[in-house]
Each structure stands twice: as structure tokens, then as C-alpha cells.
């Protein structure tokens, strides 16, 4: 049965519809906001897997080109593998939804939001999020919903709910907030040095509308009736001999948890578990069914030990206090032939960033339903398996794309405008070691490598990952969390920024009782930590170098009138090709008359610039040129002043420096005098040798008539 509900959110109505499309799915919702429409479906498999310690969820957001009235570019006219944007939106949908599924359900779950229409004004990602959340909530899959999402922008000192693409582009803050009726579950976005209070107010603003959308979803239950949920695959089980296991390993496991060094600590914990496993095996108390429960009980003890130590003793497994940051080492210029390089090491997390400068030809072309784009800044994050001491495939996964995007957003607000710095910039982060917060280490190393490459960034940027351990009575906020603190904790909050404010952030919350005061405390503790990190980075490199690397391509720009573009290009590109070949430069001509020269030799680039300026320059009487003799006849010579301009040097014209002789003496007159065997050359002919085609001669413009014809005379040195 078709049901439709709508709610005013910002400038448009959010329309949710179910019962018309994809009725064989476990759940399906069509969401529309303005002219953007997304269909989201959810299905689960029939096969059941017991004792899973994770939710087998996959989210596959996809955009159809027909949604914008386009046909895919390139040779293949079918949508192919997911684009980075689709991966990022899939992660936005996945992260707030995953904790609300019951692990005991034991079946694979697939959520597929598909953009069917877009007005290229209202971003379809936020529409897809609400479509997916509603589809899952209305399905027969056990889910602790409802949840909803809202985007907030801050522009001209005002908050805008679900802003347009143009408003996002002009804003100083762009965040996506997801949450339930119980509280915020996820925040992600970028900013241009905004304060912590503005961020908190934006989250507050978003939550007001999130609750309204959640209530709208609940209205569907009254309209269509609550569906009977599918049964859980298994009941929660515990290890039968858990008390005996606690008595056997608890204190030994506690000692192992506080061994210094990630690898040593993991090895010590593994040894304790192995000894316990052998003990229970010898008593024949382990079998295939309860072996998983045995290891789960060990993990529960480990989590209890770590959390209790932090809450009661303010002591973390590596010996730090909650606010303490690991030792930091920062270096630049490790790689001599690169354009800029930096190494940032924080404890057992290490990121090597390399900046490469290219030309506009190196820009990333994006064929997108929201409009074609060219990106002149890219950050690529690589997380090889050796960074955590493991083997595996070297490939770019969703995690790498997501972490790279967060680091890129954190840095891009500090980059110069393209008109001021017309380079394409690529930063590659190689994570060489990882024990928590590698994306924030990427921000730090990336910022320093940009400065080392000579990119005129506005401010240094640093990042830090915050964590949370809480119970019913108290909470402890952790600075610079380890990997295990991320796994065992209640919150992962990454904050990047400058000394002036925040530029990037990502928060995932696993509990429902996070208050505004808690977030304020976390942001303030993150700000203090960020200032500490910035001070260390500034001691190594505090501002961009005045010049770019000698290994980077050089750029020279000039502006010409639009109506002169054709002169620079020439017939069939002849002129611009000649400039390219002669001076070994690459020439890019924009429609607004801006010309950019790329090359490696400064002298040749300046000569190429002078050549172009001479081509477009309007000739004036009295100007002197080094012209090329193109053709000679009995009346004089045609002299090429520039590839697009010629003048005529008459044999009757007189030089300003010689009133008695003609400027040109044609060869036949010379031969006539020589027939008599004597040199009858006049004084002026001896002073001015014969001109030959191809000869370079210095000439002066003596006159320009009303038709633009140029008359020349020889110019004396």
C-alpha cells in the first residue's frame, strides 16, 4: 500500500514514500528533496552465520547519470565501479547505522541507495541517507531506529539547513550530522578555521531537525503498521567456564595489558590467552562450539581491565594520562628529488607525506552527475599491511578513500586560490606505522610537506584523535588515542585545524548519552592538544618556503585581450606550436585571455612570454623591432615583425640617420655596377649591405596608415 509523508526541512519539503517501488525488498523508501530523488532498498540473506562479532552490513550508494540527463563519458556508456564520491556517501550511511543492528541477527544485510533524479542544486547524498535510514527502520530486519541526518552550512553568520551546492561552496562550515531520538551518533565535515562554539551550535541546530525526521519515520508505523521482525539467529551465549577463566588469567592478563609497545603488548596478551586455551583443552572443556565464546570472554576481560584503569586510575595501557600526547618527531626534506616531503611520527604511528606540483593538465577531471569538475588538489592516503606488521594485498579500499578525504578536507581550506597559485597539487601519504590516528598524522605530515614544497599555505594544520571512556557515573576524555582505545572506547573524534580554528572533523559515537557539555570538553581538550602538536611542527617548518622546489615545473602567467587569443593560437595552431617548440614550454590558453606557460627553464619561459607579448602588442610609430626579411621585390622588402604582423621597408625610404641613401639596394643594381669591372657603389650602398630573405634586421615603424599598413625604416644601433 502506497504511503507518503512530508516534512519541511530548510527551504524544501522532505518527502518520504513507501509501498510503490521495489516491493520485494525487505524495505524500500523513495525520498525526495527539491528535485533530487533517491530510492533506498534493504535486503538480507537467508543463510545464517552464528557467533559473529561484527555486523555483516554493506552499503552501496550509487548515482545514475540519467538522473541529471547525462550519458556517461568515455568509451563505456554504462555506470562502472563506484566513484570515490559514491564510496564516501556509502560510508556516511554505514557508520551511524551499523551500531544499531543486532549482531545476533547473523545474516548479511545490503543497503542500496540509488539516485534517480537530481536538480544539481540539492545534494542527493543527504537525501540518500534519510531514504536508507527510513527503509531499514520500516523493514522486518531488527534495527534500533529510527535515525536521520541533516547537513548544516554556516554562511554570513547564519546556519543554513540542507544548503544548496552553491551555499556549501561559499560557506565556512559544512557538516553532516546523524542521530537518533536518544542523541547524536555521527558528525563529519570541513571548515575554514571556525571556532569550537560555532561547531557545537551547528550540531545543536542539526539535532533539532534530526528529531523531527525521526518522528516522521515513526508516523509510517502508524500508517502501515509495525512489521513483525525476523528472528535473531542465536541467543547471546557466554563461556560456560567464564568464572574459572577469570580466576585463571585476570591478573596475568592485566599485567600483559600494560606491557609497553604495541607488538610486545599484543604478544604478551596472546601468550596469556594461549596458556589458558591449553589449560581448558587439557580438561576437555573446549570444543568447536564454545571456542569462540572462550576468546570472546578473554576479550571481555581485556576491555574491562583497560576501561577500569582509565576510569578509576587515569592510567592508559602505554602509561600515559588521559590528556597526554605521545612523543612526536617531525622532519622535512627526507626525499631530495621530490618537490616536498615530510615525516611525522607520533608514538607508534608514522606517516610520510610527499607533495608533487604539476600543471593544469594534471588536474583530476570529475565526470559527475552534479556537474563536471576539475580538481587541482588531491590527497591520496595509502595504508599498506606492513604498517601494522601484517601481510596482505596492496590495494585502495573504502577505508583509504575515507581517511584520505578527511585529511584532504582538513588541508584544502588553507591552500591558495588557483589564480594565485596555478599549480595542480598532489599529496600522497604513506602510512609506515600505525597504532591509532593515522589520518591525523597524515594531516600533520601533509601540511609540512606542502610548506616544504613552497606551496603558500595560509596556516600550518595539525590533527588529533580523541576518545571517550564512560560509565553511568563519569566519563574520561582521551587525547591522541591508540588503536585499542578506539576499539574499546565509546567515541572516536578526530579534529584537525590551525591555531585559529577547526578545518576538519569526524566523530563516531557508540553510546547515546553524549551531552553538549561532553562534546565541548572534548573539543577544548582537542584544541589544547592541537596547539601542542602545532608548536612541534612549527619548530621544524613554520611557513611556506619562498620558492618552489627546483625540481618542480615553473609557471609564468600573462593576461591578454580576448580578441587577441586567435593571434596567439594562429592558423590551425601554427603560432602556439612554434612557441612551444622554440622555447620548450607548454602553453595553456583560457577563454578569458589568461595564458599560462609551463616549463623548466626560467630564461626560455621569459622569452616565450616576451614573444607572446610582442604578438598581441599593438604597433606604434617609433617602436623598434628585430624583423625577419620575408620577401624582397623591386620596390623594397616585406619584414615580419611578429608572427601576425608585417611591415614594408621601401627602397625609397630614408633612415633617420642617413638622408642620402635608400635603405635597400637590390642585387641587380649591384651586378650592373660590377659589369664595368670597377666598384661604382655609392657611399650609402656601402654602408647598407644587401638584404636577403631570412635575414634579421633592426627596423623602426615610421608610419601606420588608416588601413593599418605599416611602413618601416632601418634603425641604426
Curated annotation (Swiss-Prot):
Predominant localisation class: cytoplasm
Localisation per UniProt entry: Cytoplasm
Protein's name according to its UniProt entry: Polyribonucleotide nucleotidyltransferase
Role this protein plays: Involved in mRNA degradation. Catalyzes the phosphorolysis of single-stranded polyribonucleotides processively in the 3'- to 5'-direction.
Stored HAMAP family: PNPase (MF_01595)
Keyword presence, Transmembrane: no
Residues where Mg(2+) binds: 486, 492
UniProt biased composition (Basic and acidic residues): 654-666
EC number: 2.7.7.8
Cofactor(s) in the UniProt record: Mg(2+)
Record has Ribonucleoprotein as a keyword: no
SMART domains reported for this sequence: KH, S1
Catalytic reaction(s) noted: RNA(n+1) + phosphate = RNA(n) + a ribonucleoside 5'-diphosphate
CDD domains: KH-I_PNPase, RNase_PH_PNPase_1, RNase_PH_PNPase_2
Entry keywords, A to Z: Cytoplasm, Magnesium, Metal-binding, Nucleotidyltransferase, RNA-binding, Transferase
GO MF, one example: 3'-5'-RNA exonuclease activity
Gene Ontology BP terms: mRNA catabolic process; RNA processing
Alphabetized InterPro entries for the sequence: ExoRNase_PH_dom1, ExoRNase_PH_dom2, ExoRNase_PH_dom2_sf, KH_dom, KH_dom_type_1, KH_dom_type_1_sf, NA-bd_OB-fold, PNPase
All residue ranges annotated as the S1 motif domain in the record: 622-715
PANTHER family noted in UniProt: POLYRIBONUCLEOTIDE NUCLEOTIDYLTRANSFERASE (PTHR11252), POLYRIBONUCLEOTIDE NUCLEOTIDYLTRANSFERASE 1, MITOCHONDRIAL (PTHR11252:SF0)
Family to which the UniProt record says this protein belongs: Belongs to the polyribonucleotide nucleotidyltransferase family.
Cellular component terms per the entry's GO annotation: cytosol
Amino acid at each position: 500500500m502506497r504511503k507518503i509523508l512530508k516534512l519541511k526541512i530548510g527551504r524544501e519539503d522532505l518527502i518520504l514514500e513507501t509501498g510503490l517501488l521495489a516491493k520485494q525488498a525487505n524495505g524500500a523508501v523513495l525520498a525526495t528533496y527539491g528535485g533530487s530523488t533517491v530510492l533506498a532498498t534493504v535486503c538480507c540473506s537467508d543463510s545464517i552465520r552464528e557467533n559473529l562479532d561484527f555486523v555483516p552490513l554493506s552499503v552501496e550508494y550509487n548515482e545514475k547519470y540519467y538522473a541529471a540527463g547525462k550519458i556517461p563519458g568515455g568509451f563505456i556508456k554504462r555506470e562502472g565501479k563506484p566513484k570515490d564520491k559514491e564510496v564516501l556517501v556509502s560510508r556516511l550511511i554505514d557508520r551511524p547505522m551499523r551500531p544499531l543492528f543486532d549482531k545476533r541477527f547473523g545474516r548479511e544485510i545490503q543497503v542500496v541507495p540509488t539516485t534517480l533524479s537530481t536538480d544539481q542544486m540539492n545534494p542527493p547524498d543527504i537525501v540518500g541517507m534519510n531514504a536508507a535510514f527510513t527503509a531499514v527502520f520500516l523493514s522486518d530486519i531488527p534495527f534500533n531506529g529510527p535515525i536521520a541526518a541533516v547537513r548544516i552550512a554556516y554562511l554570513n553568520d547564519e546556519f543554513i539547513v540542507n544548503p544548496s551546492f552553491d551555499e556549501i561552496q561559499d560557506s565556512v562550515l559544512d557538516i553532516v550530522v546523524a542521530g537518533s531520538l536518544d542523541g547524536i551518533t555521527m558528525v563529519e565535515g570541513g571548515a575554514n578555521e571556525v571556532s569550537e562554539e560555532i561547531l557545537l551550535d551547528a550540531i545543536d541546530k542539526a539535532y533539532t531537525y534530526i528529531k523531527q525526521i525521526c518522528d516522521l519515520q515513526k508516523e509510517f508505523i502508524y500508517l502501515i503498521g509495525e512489521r513483525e521482525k525476523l528472528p535473531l539467529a542465536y541467543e547471546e551465549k557466554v563461556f560456560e567456564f567464564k568464572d574459572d577463566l577469570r580466576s585463571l588469567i585476570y591478573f596475568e592478563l592485566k599485567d600483559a595489558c600494560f606491557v609497553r609497545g604495541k607488538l610486545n603488548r599484543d604478544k604478551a596478551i596472546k601468550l596469556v590467552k594461549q596458556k589458558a586455551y591449553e589449560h581448558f583443552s587439557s580438561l576437555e572443556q573446549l570444543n568447536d562450539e564454545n571456542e569462540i565464546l572462550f576468546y570472546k570472554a578473554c576479550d571481555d576481560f581485556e576491555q574491562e581491565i583497560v576501561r577500569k584503569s582509565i576510569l578509576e586510575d587515569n592510567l592508559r595501557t602505554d602509561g600515559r594520562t588521559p590528556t597526554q600526547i605521545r612523543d612526536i618527531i617531525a622532519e622535512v626534506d627526507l626525499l631530495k628529488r621530490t618537490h616536498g616531503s615530510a615525516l611525522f611520527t607520533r608514538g607508534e604511528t608514522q606517516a610520510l607525506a610527499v607533495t608533487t606540483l604539476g600543471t593544469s593538465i594534471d588536474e583530476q577531471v570529475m565526470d559527475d552527475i552534479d556537474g563536471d569538475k576539475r580538481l587541482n588538489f588531491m590527497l591520496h592516503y595509502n595504508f599498506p599491511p606492513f604498517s601494522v606488521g601484517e601481510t596482505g594485498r596492496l590495494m585502495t579500499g573504502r577505508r583509504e578513500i575515507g581517511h584520505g578525504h578527511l585529511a584532504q578536507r582538513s588541508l584544502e581550506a588553507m591552500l591558495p586560490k588557483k589564480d594565485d597559485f596555478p599549480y595542480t597539487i598532489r599529496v600522497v601519504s604513506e602510512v609506515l606505522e600505525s597504532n591509532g590516528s593515522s589520518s591525523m598524522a597524515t594531516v600533520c605530515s601533509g601540511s609540512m610537506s606542502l610548506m616544504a614544497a613552497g606551496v603558500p599555505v595560509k596556516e600550518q594544520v595539525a590533527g588529533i584523535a580523541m576518545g571517550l571512556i564512560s560509565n553511568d557515573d563519569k566519563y574520561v576524555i582521551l587525547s591522541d588515542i591508540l588503536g585499542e582505545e578506539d576499539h574499546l572506547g565509546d567515541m572516536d573524534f578526530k579534529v584537525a585545524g590551525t591555531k585559529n580554528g577547526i578545518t576538519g572533523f569526524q566523530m563516531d559515537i557508540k553510546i547515546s548519552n553524549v551531552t553538549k557539555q561532553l562534546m565541548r570538553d572534548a573539543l577544548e581538550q582537542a584544541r589544547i592538544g592541537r596547539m601542542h602538536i602545532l608548536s612541534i611542527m612549527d619548530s621544524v617548518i613554520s611557513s611556506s618556503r619562498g620558492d618552489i622546489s627546483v625540481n618542480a615545473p615553473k609557471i609564468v602567467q600573462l593576461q591578454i585581450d580576448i580578441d587577441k587569443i586567435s593571434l596567439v593560437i594562429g592558423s590551425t595552431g601554427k603560432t602556439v606550436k612554434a612557441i612551444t617548440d622554440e622555447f620548450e614550454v607548454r602553453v595553456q590558453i583560457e577563454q578569458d585571455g589568461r595564458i599560462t606557460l609551463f616549463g623548466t627553464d626560467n630564461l626560455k619561459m621569459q622569452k616565450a612570454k616576451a614573444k607572446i607579448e610582442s604578438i598581441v602588442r599593438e604597433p606604434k610609430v617609433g617602436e623598434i623591432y628585430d624583423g625577419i626579411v620575408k620577401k624582397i621585390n623591386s620596390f623594397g622588402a616585406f619584414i615580419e615583425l611578429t608572427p601576425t604582423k608585417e611591415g614594408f621597408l621601401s627602397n625609397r625610404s630614408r633612415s633617420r640617420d642617413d638622408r642620402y641613401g635608400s635603405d635597400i639596394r637590390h642585387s641587380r643594381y649591384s651586378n650592373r655596377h660590377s659589369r664595368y669591372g670597377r666598384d661604382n657603389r655609392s657611399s650609402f650602398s656601402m654602408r647598407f649591405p644587401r638584404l636577403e630573405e631570412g635575414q634579421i634586421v633592426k627596423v623602426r615603424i615610421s608610419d601606420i596608415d588608416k588601413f593599418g599598413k605599416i611602413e618601416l625604416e632601418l634603425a641604426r644601433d
